[in-house]
Protein backbone atom coordinates (compact mmCIF):
# COMPACT_ATOMS: atom_id res chain seq x y z
CA UNK A 1 0.00 0.00 0.00
CA UNK A 2 1.14 3.53 -0.67
CA UNK A 3 -0.29 7.00 -0.11
CA UNK A 4 -0.35 9.28 -3.13
CA UNK A 5 0.23 12.97 -2.34
CA UNK A 6 -2.52 15.40 -3.36
CA UNK A 7 -2.00 17.35 -6.58
CA UNK A 8 -0.62 20.87 -6.43
CA UNK A 9 1.19 20.40 -3.11
CA UNK A 10 4.68 21.86 -2.81
CA UNK A 11 7.60 20.44 -0.88
CA UNK A 12 8.73 22.01 2.40
CA UNK A 13 12.38 21.83 3.43
CA UNK A 14 12.57 20.60 7.03
CA UNK A 15 16.35 20.88 7.08
CA UNK A 16 17.81 17.53 6.08
CA UNK A 17 14.54 16.14 4.68
CA UNK A 18 11.65 17.51 2.65
CA UNK A 19 7.93 16.83 3.18
CA UNK A 20 4.69 18.06 1.63
CA UNK A 21 3.42 21.48 2.76
CA UNK A 22 -0.31 21.59 3.57
CA UNK A 23 -2.11 24.87 4.28
CA UNK A 24 -4.24 25.89 7.26
CA UNK A 25 -7.97 25.99 6.52
CA UNK A 26 -7.73 23.53 3.64
CA UNK A 27 -8.78 19.91 3.22
CA UNK A 28 -6.81 17.38 1.22
CA UNK A 29 -7.79 14.03 -0.32
CA UNK A 30 -5.06 11.46 -0.81
CA UNK A 31 -5.39 8.16 -2.64
CA UNK A 32 -4.58 4.96 -0.78
CA UNK A 33 -3.09 2.86 -3.58
CA UNK A 34 -3.54 -0.82 -2.89
CA UNK A 35 -1.39 -3.33 -4.76
CA UNK A 36 0.03 -6.82 -4.51
CA UNK A 37 2.28 -9.03 -6.62
CA UNK A 38 -0.68 -9.93 -8.85
CA UNK A 39 -1.81 -6.27 -9.22
CA UNK A 40 -5.29 -7.34 -8.20
CA UNK A 41 -6.77 -6.19 -4.90
CA UNK A 42 -10.40 -6.77 -4.02
CA UNK A 43 -12.75 -4.05 -2.80
CA UNK A 44 -13.09 -5.56 0.70
CA UNK A 45 -9.67 -4.33 1.76
CA UNK A 46 -10.54 -0.77 2.73
CA UNK A 47 -11.03 -1.05 6.50
CA UNK A 48 -8.33 1.22 7.99
CA UNK A 49 -7.31 2.98 11.18
CA UNK A 50 -5.62 6.37 11.00
CA UNK A 51 -3.22 7.83 13.55
CA UNK A 52 -1.62 11.27 13.58
CA UNK A 53 1.69 11.73 15.36
CA UNK A 54 4.16 14.57 15.59
CA UNK A 55 7.89 14.07 15.20
CA UNK A 56 10.27 16.52 16.88
CA UNK A 57 9.79 19.20 19.51
CA UNK A 58 8.66 22.79 19.95
CA UNK A 59 9.34 25.45 22.56
CA UNK A 60 6.38 26.91 24.43
CA UNK A 61 6.07 29.65 27.01
CA UNK A 62 3.93 32.11 28.90
CA UNK A 63 2.62 35.00 26.81
CA UNK A 64 0.59 37.96 28.10
CA UNK A 65 -1.44 40.49 26.15
CA UNK A 66 -3.10 43.67 27.45
CA UNK A 67 -4.07 47.15 26.31
CA UNK A 68 -0.54 48.28 27.15
CA UNK A 69 1.19 45.71 24.97
CA UNK A 70 2.15 42.07 24.73
CA UNK A 71 5.17 39.95 25.50
CA UNK A 72 6.73 36.73 26.69
CA UNK A 73 7.52 36.27 30.37
CA UNK A 74 9.17 32.91 29.70
CA UNK A 75 9.71 30.61 26.74
CA UNK A 76 11.84 27.66 27.75
CA UNK A 77 9.38 24.76 28.00
CA UNK A 78 10.36 22.06 25.46
CA UNK A 79 7.26 20.11 24.38
CA UNK A 80 7.26 16.83 22.44
CA UNK A 81 5.47 17.65 19.16
CA UNK A 82 3.59 14.35 19.38
CA UNK A 83 1.71 15.63 22.46
CA UNK A 84 0.14 18.50 20.52
CA UNK A 85 0.00 17.24 16.89
CA UNK A 86 -3.71 16.37 17.03
CA UNK A 87 -4.51 20.04 17.81
CA UNK A 88 -3.78 21.06 14.21
CA UNK A 89 -5.12 18.35 11.90
CA UNK A 90 -7.90 15.80 11.65
CA UNK A 91 -7.64 12.69 9.49
CA UNK A 92 -10.07 10.02 8.35
CA UNK A 93 -10.48 7.38 5.66
CA UNK A 94 -13.39 6.52 3.44
CA UNK A 95 -12.89 3.68 1.01
CA UNK A 96 -9.45 4.16 -0.51
CA UNK A 97 -9.25 7.88 0.29
CA UNK A 98 -7.37 9.50 3.16
CA UNK A 99 -8.75 12.92 4.11
CA UNK A 100 -6.57 15.44 5.95
CA UNK A 101 -8.10 18.66 7.26
CA UNK A 102 -5.67 21.32 8.55
CA UNK A 103 -7.64 23.14 11.25
CA UNK A 104 -5.23 25.45 13.06
CA UNK A 105 -1.93 27.30 12.60
CA UNK A 106 1.03 26.19 14.72
CA UNK A 107 1.42 29.65 16.22
CA UNK A 108 -2.24 29.72 17.31
CA UNK A 109 -1.51 26.88 19.76
CA UNK A 110 -1.71 27.38 23.51
CA UNK A 111 -2.56 24.99 26.33
CA UNK A 112 -4.83 27.35 28.27
CA UNK A 113 -5.60 31.02 28.71
CA UNK A 114 -6.82 33.22 31.55
CA UNK A 115 -8.20 36.74 31.31
CA UNK A 116 -8.26 39.00 34.36
CA UNK A 117 -7.96 42.64 35.35
CA UNK A 118 -4.38 43.56 36.29
CA UNK A 119 -3.70 46.83 38.06
CA UNK A 120 -1.90 49.23 35.73
CA UNK A 121 -2.52 47.06 32.64
CA UNK A 122 -6.30 46.64 32.57
CA UNK A 123 -7.72 43.49 31.05
CA UNK A 124 -4.84 41.05 30.57
CA UNK A 125 -4.93 37.66 28.88
CA UNK A 126 -2.18 35.20 29.78
CA UNK A 127 -1.59 32.17 27.55
CA UNK A 128 0.03 29.11 29.14
CA UNK A 129 2.31 26.96 26.97
CA UNK A 130 1.77 29.09 23.86
CA UNK A 131 3.94 27.96 20.97
CA UNK A 132 7.05 30.16 20.81
CA UNK A 133 9.28 28.38 18.28
CA UNK A 134 9.88 25.14 16.45
CA UNK A 135 13.10 23.28 17.24
CA UNK A 136 15.64 21.59 14.99
CA UNK A 137 16.64 18.05 15.99
CA UNK A 138 20.08 16.43 15.88
CA UNK A 139 19.46 15.34 12.26
CA UNK A 140 18.85 18.96 11.25
CA UNK A 141 15.07 18.56 10.82
CA UNK A 142 12.20 20.69 12.10
CA UNK A 143 9.05 19.04 13.51
CA UNK A 144 6.59 17.44 11.10
CA UNK A 145 3.36 15.43 11.08
CA UNK A 146 3.27 11.71 10.38
CA UNK A 147 -0.02 10.06 9.41
CA UNK A 148 -0.08 6.26 9.56
CA UNK A 149 -2.86 4.36 7.79
CA UNK A 150 -3.06 0.72 8.86
CA UNK A 151 -5.39 -2.04 7.72
CA UNK A 152 -7.41 -3.23 10.73
CA UNK A 153 -7.20 -6.97 10.10
CA UNK A 154 -4.30 -7.55 7.71
CA UNK A 155 -1.88 -5.20 9.45
CA UNK A 156 -0.19 -3.62 6.42
CA UNK A 157 0.35 0.13 6.60
CA UNK A 158 1.65 3.24 4.86
CA UNK A 159 2.81 6.62 6.14
CA UNK A 160 2.55 10.20 4.91
CA UNK A 161 4.77 13.05 6.18
CA UNK A 162 3.84 16.73 6.00
CA UNK A 163 4.20 20.14 7.60
CA UNK A 164 1.57 22.87 7.83
CA UNK A 165 1.79 26.53 6.95
CA UNK A 166 -0.36 29.53 6.17
CA UNK A 167 -1.05 30.37 2.55
CA UNK A 168 -0.45 33.92 1.39
CA UNK A 169 -3.06 34.93 -1.16
CA UNK A 170 -2.26 38.62 -1.59
CA UNK A 171 0.52 41.06 -0.72
CA UNK A 172 -0.28 44.77 -0.66
CA UNK A 173 2.69 47.09 -0.17
CA UNK A 174 1.90 50.27 1.75
CA UNK A 175 4.25 52.37 -0.39
CA UNK A 176 4.30 52.49 -4.15
CA UNK A 177 8.04 53.09 -4.41
CA UNK A 178 10.74 50.66 -3.35
CA UNK A 179 14.17 52.22 -2.80
CA UNK A 180 17.42 50.26 -2.74
Q: Which residues are covered by each model-predicted region?
A:
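Extracellular interdomain linker/stem segments of modular secreted and single-pass surface proteins
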Residues: 7, 165-171
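Strand-loop-strand motifs at the edges of beta-sheets in extracellular beta-sandwich domains
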Residues: 88-108
Amino acid sequence: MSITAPTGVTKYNLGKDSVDLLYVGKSYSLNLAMDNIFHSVGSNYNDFTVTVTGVGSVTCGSYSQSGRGAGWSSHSNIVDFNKIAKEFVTCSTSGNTLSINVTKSLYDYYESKETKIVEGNGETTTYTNKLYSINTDSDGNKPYFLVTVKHKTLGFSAQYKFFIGEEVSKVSPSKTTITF
